[in-house]
Amino acid sequence: MQRDKVQRLLGLAARAGGVAYGEGAAEESVRSKRARLAVVAADASDNTKKRLGDKCAFYGVRLIELGDRYELGGCMGKDFAVAAAVTNAGLAKEILKQYESRDGE
């Protein structure tokens, strides 16, 4: 995973208005089928991870884990964020591509 690129792309998506911030907004975005990708902080509670993971599995949305709540929020211009949903399809695809790639390839 190329974390810096993923974080920059999340920031771009946020500036473009293509991100739903926070646990509740991310869940609602997944439930309403607007989300193309969901992101959860590594230090989110087990309950949050399970609830968002279950929603993503049910609605067919990919879920990734990225950094802690301060890293996740910081890359999107917030103090912190436990969860977020990317609604822009093109940026979600590129974020996922960078997340799955390995350094040096």
Where are these regions (language model features)?
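Small/polar loops that bind or transfer phosphate-bearing groups
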Residues: 40-41, 64, 83-87
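C-terminal structural segments of small proteins and small subunits
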Residues: 70-105
